[in-house]
Amino acid sequence: MDQYFYSTQIYDDFLILPEDEAHHALKVLRKKTGDEIIVVDGNGGLYEALFENENARNCNLKIINSKKNIGRPNHNIHIGISPPKSHDRLEWFIEKSVEIGIQEISFILTENSERKNIKLNRILKRAISSMKQSLKTYLPKINDMVSAKDFIVNCSNNEKFIAYLSEDENQHLLKSASAQNDYCILMDQRETFLHLKLRDLKNLVFYLFH
């Protein structure tokens, strides 16, 4: 059984599949009452459950086994990034972030941003799809657009880094970061941060890396 379904409506001994998930299971995969599937909740929970009915609009499943904190990481990574103009590149970034286990993603709005707004629902759907396809149990927290200045000032992670291209020899991230910690990584083109003054970033304990 190598396919996951997603639901956040998890109760003591049963769960409810969202209509789109239930429709795929019942109409496409031809699941029947009594058939078993695996459901994840996006927060480390994994549930083996049996269909109790075949109603896509109100699909109940009986939980027969459950596990918590499956694949829980020993670190926390928060990525701040100015979203690319291309939908394909943005969706690729979301997919890879889920696959490698990024815990939080914030989209940064700057004077040079190629995209001034994002569709959170579409992005979340892509993240859920990637989680199921890669057999993961955690979804990253995905935040709406925020200004670069507000993001940097309000960032509360223990270790903070900025990917920055320059002629100076900046430290490599693997040599800069300590193990098993709480990280914030700000990623974008160099021009994005010119108006923020790099010396101010250093005063806010953001370290440059390449």
Task: Pin down the residues of each PLM region.
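A mid-sequence, solvent-exposed acidic-amphipathic segment
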Residues: 145-179, 183-185
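Conserved residues at the C-terminal ends of beta-strands
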Residues: 108, 163, 207-209
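Short, surface-exposed acidic/glycine-rich loop or hinge patches that mediate macromolecular interfaces
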Residues: 84, 188-190
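Mobile, glycine- and charge-enriched loop segments
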Residues: 37, 62, 70-83, 177-181
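Hydrophobic side chains in well-ordered alpha-helices
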Residues: 25, 89-93, 197
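RNA substrate-binding interface of SAM-dependent RNA methyltransferases
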Residues: 70-161
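N-terminal positively charged helical leader segments and presequences
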Residues: 1-68, 121
